[in-house]
């Protein structure tokens, strides 16, 4: 397995966070296909060319393991350092057209949307994630609660990450997506076991009344390419 070093990942993360006057973006394409292996093989091979053509920071694929909105869904994601970078791209520039022409897998594009990245984490080669779609009337209070929860989880030895996105287009506009993850599935599972503990429930109770959980799902993600730093 090709390993993405923590140093490189850290540089990518710091690059995202350094844009004080910019807003990082995730472009997310939801694809439905019966040939998951074929689609993943194409994405892995084409990703280095696609991120270069689109000025993306990174690109990869996530596949639900439970809770998928539709069986056969997969999520092709790209990270951009700013809205400006994301918007200046032609979705079907010559390189994209050329690479898509190589894809011989039957598939349906169910959605193609942008998500604001409001909490970033270092990237890993592969990871396991528990995601929630949440509606909230107070994003700042909710983010503060999530920050407290992540800090306490880590303080108690749970080596997890917590990415947070806000939908910017499509039916998920304004929806918050929380993605708690780990490089090891058992590590993520242990962190989820902590939900039964008093300290966890106390932290969640501080923001539970300000949110409505819409949908939950689990997935496995792979990073296929990162821009040179």
Predicted regions located by residue number:
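N-terminal signal peptide c-region/cleavage motif recognized by signal peptidases
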Residues: 15-19
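Bacterial N-terminal signal peptides that target proteins for export
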Residues: 1-11
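Short S/T/G/P-rich N-terminal loop/turn motif that feeds into the first structured element of a domain
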Residues: 21-229
